[in-house]
């Protein structure tokens, strides 16, 4: 029997497992598919909410703490696994921002570098970017990570740890209860028992918890993205315009996203989204009209009310914990939300006030 059973092998589940394993706990992690291959793979990897000043304090608090973790985490994983998560801090250009006064006020309150810039500044930073039609902002400290590589590195590190057992292609079929207490799960690979359970199921978390008659308000929200194969160096930093973004990778791939679709668990791609994403991409970087689209894919975000994740123990099952519902910001919030959960699991002083994230009866109603 493990100390902890983690259900879900995305970035949230794997970071939870890593922190618990670092603390000497025995961990079993079960994943219905392959670790790091759902939303953790499908996203863009920007280590910030797209427009951070538009979020409430619960999301902002997690984001602020998490942003500072990625440089060290990426170096650690590269050293331990040889896989480079490609954390890069080259800043972000916001084009056509209609609430720039609010953004600058937010930045001043936090002491965060953010400045209003003109078309010549934009051209200096990104010569191929379209001239901004309205206000433009520059955030020099923003970073991004190559999230598929981050997932690979986390999985490789966990697989090498003697106190971690990874079980992939392992579907949870129900919870095992004895004398009113949850002691494990039934899976297609047999029973898995543990003292404490952590549900990190992303968009599937609500489905999992139906087995305990818990109604978790987390739903799948589809996002489609495309990637261009462009000459290396065409774009150097993240550029965001009208809610869509271009993210450069070191090998010349340029990611463009993303749609927001209420489509259940459907992950199919379609021509309408492709046309829309190409139009957005060419409005940001006109030269992309001459570059081929190399990839088109979709992922499922775990949508939740106000994008505030559920982090903590279930009211009626004190040894069953949740860490789910991060919506568009799973990668962004993962270091802080997993640290906060592990604080609760190990009885440590919490990183921050856990109250806004607790899965209370009121939030589950």
Predicted segments with their positions:
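N-terminal Rossmann-like FAD-binding beta1-loop-alpha1 element of flavoenzymes
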Residues: 2-29
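Active-site substrate-recognition segment that forms the wall
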Residues: 15-23, 45-47, 83-88, 181, ...
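Glycine-rich FAD pyrophosphate-binding loop
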Residues: 21-43
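Dinucleotide-binding Rossmann-like beta1-alpha1 core, especially the glycine-rich loop
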Residues: 46-125, 280-282
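Short beta-strand to alpha-helix junction loop
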Residues: 61-64, 94-100, 138-156, 268-273, ...
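Helix-loop-beta segment of a Rossmann-like dinucleotide-binding subdomain
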Residues: 82-94, 105-108, 113-161, 183, ...
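Helical element adjacent to the flavin cofactor pocket in flavoenzyme catalytic cores
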Residues: 137-196, 206
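C-terminal catalytic lobe of FAD-dependent flavoproteins
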Residues: 285-365
């Amino acid at each position: 029997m493990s100390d902890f059973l983690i259900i879900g092998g995305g970035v949230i589940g794997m970071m939870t497992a890593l922190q618990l394993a670092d603390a000497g706990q025995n961990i079993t992690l079960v994943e219905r598919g392959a670790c790091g291959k759902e939303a953790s793979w499908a996203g863009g990897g920007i280590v910030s909410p797209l427009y951070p000043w538009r979020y409430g304090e619960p999301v902002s608090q997690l984001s602020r703490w998490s942003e500072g973790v990625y440089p060290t985490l990426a170096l650690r994983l590269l050293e331990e696994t040889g896989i480079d998560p490609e954390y890069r801090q080259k800043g972000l250009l916001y084009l056509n921002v209609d609430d720039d006064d609010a953004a600058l006020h937010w930045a001043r309150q936090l002491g965060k570098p953010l400045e209003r810039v003109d078309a010549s500044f934009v051209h200096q930073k990104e010569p191929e970017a379209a001239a901004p039609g309205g206000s433009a902002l520059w955030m020099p400290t923003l970073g991004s990570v190559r999230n598929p590589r981050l997932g690979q590195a986390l999985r490789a590190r966990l697989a090498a740890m003697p106190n971690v057992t990874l079980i992939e292609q392992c579907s949870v079929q129900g919870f095992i209860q004895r004398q009113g207490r949850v002691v494990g799960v039934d899976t297609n690979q047999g029973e898995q028992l543990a003292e404490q359970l952590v549900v990190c199921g992303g968009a599937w978390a609500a489905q999992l918890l139906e087995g305990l008659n818990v109604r978790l308000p987390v739903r799948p929200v589809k996002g489609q993205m495309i990637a261009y194969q462009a000459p290396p160096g065409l774009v150097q930093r993240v550029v965001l315009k009208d809610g869509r973004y271009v993210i450069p990778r070191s090998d010349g791939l340029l990611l463009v996203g993303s749609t927001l679709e209420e489509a259940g668990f459907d992950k199919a791609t379609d021509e309408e989204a492709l046309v829309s994403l190409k139009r957005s991409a060419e409005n940001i970087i006109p030269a992309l009209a001459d570059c081929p689209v190399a990839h088109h894919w979709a992922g499922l975000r775990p949508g939740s009310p106000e994008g505030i994740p559920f982090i903590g123990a279930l009211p009626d099952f004190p040894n069953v914990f949740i860490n789910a519902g991060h919506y568009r910001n799973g990668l962004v919030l993962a270091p802080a939300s997993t640290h906060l959960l592990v604080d609760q699991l190990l009885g440590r002083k919490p990183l921050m006030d856990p109250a806004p994230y607790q899965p209370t009866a009121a939030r589950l109603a």
